[in-house]
């Protein structure tokens, strides 16, 4: 299957990580250690920023088999609800200002989409599969924690809001602005010649590899960047 989950500007959402690590730097064991390290960092700063304590079994880890050029994983953190993707992006930005989240893709915090559990990228056979990881003396959430595999799948969607999230404090844009002065995204200086803007854009698009035109996620990211 080749399914993706998407969201709108004001969709309530859970925090997640998208990790892609090059095979030349990692083996399976090192990649699992990277996953654990990044999970612990998110747990640490959720407590520091929002006074929320993620439990290890609030965390769902999805991982592909080793690919020719990389290891990939999606991590979903259940239990704390964010007002929208912009608030998630702010959480990520504030974390990385204090501590590195190695090999994590920040582009997922836009108005974009995320590949679902059991799905692969089109034309490839590396689906994201649930894995159970031991962190300290506890294990991350797994299929066996739910009555059915469908129940588990629904919980892997970051737009699924259940009773636990509704009971907890939602992290809103208003709260973030009141607590912290959120900096704007850095703008790269460009040539101010408006007459050349259309030409420059055509030049950029003409030099894109073909795969960027054939894969929705990559094309979507190009659009957001431009």
Q: Where do the model's predicted regions map?
A:
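Short, hydrophobic/amphipathic alpha-helical patches that form generic packing surfaces
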Residues: 115-118, 220-226
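Non-membrane alpha-helical secondary structure
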Residues: 142-149, 193-200, 218
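Long, composition-driven mixed-charge/polar low-complexity segments
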Residues: 103, 109-110
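Long, low-complexity, charged/polar intrinsically disordered accessory regions
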Residues: 110-190
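Short basic/aromatic active-site micro-motif
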Residues: 111, 216-221
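Signature for HUH/AEP ssDNA processing cores
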Residues: 1-73, 77-101, 114, 120, ...
């Amino acid at each position: 299957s080749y399914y993706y989950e998407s969201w709108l500007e004001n969709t309530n959402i859970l925090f997640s990580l998208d990790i892609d690590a090059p095979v030349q730097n990692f083996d399976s064991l090192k990649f699992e250690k990277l996953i654990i390290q990044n999970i612990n960092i998110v747990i640490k700063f959720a407590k520091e920023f929002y006074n929320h304590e993620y439990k290890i079994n609030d965390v769902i880890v999805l991982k592909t088999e080793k690919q020719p050029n990389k290891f990939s994983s999606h991590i979903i953190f259940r239990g704390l609800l964010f007002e929208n993707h912009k608030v998630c992006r702010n959480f990520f930005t504030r974390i990385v200002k204090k501590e590195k989240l190695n090999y994590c893709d920040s582009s997922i915090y836009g108005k974009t989409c995320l590949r679902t559990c059991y799905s692969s990228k089109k034309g490839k056979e590396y689906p994201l599969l649930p894995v159970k990881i031991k962190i300290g003396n506890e294990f991350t959430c797994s299929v066996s924690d739910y009555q059915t595999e469908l129940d588990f799948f629904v919980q892997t969607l970051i737009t699924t809001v259940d009773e636990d999230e509704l009971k907890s404090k939602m992290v809103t844009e208003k709260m973030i602005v009141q607590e912290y002065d959120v900096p704007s995204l850095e703008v790269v200086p460009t040539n101010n010649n408006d007459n050349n803007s259309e030409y420059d854009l055509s030049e950029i698009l003409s030099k894109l590899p073909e795969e960027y035109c054939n894969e929705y996620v990559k094309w979507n990211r190009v659009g957001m960047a431009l």
